[in-house]
Amino acid sequence: MSFFDIFKKKKSKDVAKDRLMMMLAYERANTKIENLDEMKKDLINVVKKYLNVKDVHIKSNSNQDIETLEVEIILNK
């Protein structure tokens, strides 16, 4: 990363990726954050912006030692 990269506007895909990584980190740490639902909505909006989708669902699961964040994207035909 160069000094001038600081002033470049991030693409929405990069912002969505960063938010997803942040959500995963908080979910793994079992830390509740107040804006997690807002971040999930933002992620859904970015997916809908770039894909022709019918619906998008995001849910988190925890089984024993494994925690997952599941993203289900239903595409239009």
Swiss-Prot record:
It comes from the Bacteria. Pfam families: MinE. Coiled coil: none annotated. The keyword Cytoplasm does not apply. Keywords: Cell cycle, Cell division. InterPro entries: MinE, MinE_sf. One of its GO terms (biological process) is cell division. Belongs to the MinE family. Prevents the cell division inhibition by proteins MinC and MinD at internal division sites while permitting inhibition at polar sites. This ensures cell division at the proper site by restricting the formation of a division septum at the midpoint of the long axis of the cell. This is Cell division topological specificity factor.
